[in-house]
């Protein structure tokens, strides 16, 4: 972990790519969290298999990026149930794109695929969007500003149906 500690001391943020459904996924996630001390986990939805690690991520407010469209290339599904479980636990899970040209989906397509397949509510989609800012490495003031923009949009938008 020495190289990572050196990077942090120089002001860099640490994230780890923890592929889904791999051999020893939980061990990889645990190492990223406990040994390396990441500030964010990319992919890593297998964390729902270990409540202690999920609780740790929630307590430490470690963000988790997910990429539903690319998940379906390496797994039987897009891991929507796991994403929803993480969201329900209060974990700062966000939806992102992952090499859009290769996996066929920019961020909007990833949101749409997840919302459509799992019948997400507006509140769930809004929370995922807020999580993307709250778990980012922008300043706290920028986070507040962007989250307020989301709140303002939602307050002024006439949603025609309860689900997106």
Predicted regions and their residues:
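Short secondary-structure capping/turn micro-motifs that flank functional sites
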Residues: 22-24, 48-50, 73-74, 102-104, ...
